[in-house]
Amino acid sequence: MHSVHRNMHLLALGSNATGESSSNAGLLAQAYDAIKAGLSGTLRSSRLFSTPAFPKGSGPDFVNACAVVESDLSPEAMLALCHRIEAEMGRVRTQRWGQRVIDIDLLAVGDQILPDRATVAHWMELPLEDQMRLAPEHLLLPHPRLHQRGFVLVPLVDVAPDWVHPLTGQSVRAMLEALDPAEIAEIRPI
């Protein structure tokens, strides 16, 4: 008998397509079910949170959540699963950071850095204006902006408070505590 190596995948999920929290929450539940059906592993999910659209004023509020998935999938296979689920649920990628039926982001896979430390560090340091107009051509892990986003860190602390960012050396809890309180003031559990 051989053991299967399980990776800890951190996912962020969000929806603001309907403009109604209850409908968007239902879309997140549908996405969770699809993720569970697409893998042989475990999934732990955070509470659901109402969060302002990012950038602020760009659309209706989101319902956001995070999940920890223990699976033998590679980062690329998990990303492909997330994109397939988004497409099946009707997500069309037209506007960067625009309104969406479902958004499933692969935040991190354990302590892996992809494609390399320098590339991820470069994307982490991009000014907001550049972040809004540029998109990476390949998978970046950890997600280059997760440490700056309250709408990610608030639900992520529910399921992975002690996960440590391999570039910053900070835990999720520490990254959340380092945010400006204004960044999380409007984030509310549903």
Question: Which role does the model predict for each range below?
Answer:
Residues 1-40, 46-52:
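N-terminal beta1-alpha1 ligand-phosphate binding loop
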Residues 44-71:
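Short, charge-patterned binding micro-sites
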Residues 22-23, 73-80, 115-116:
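Short, conserved charged micro-motifs
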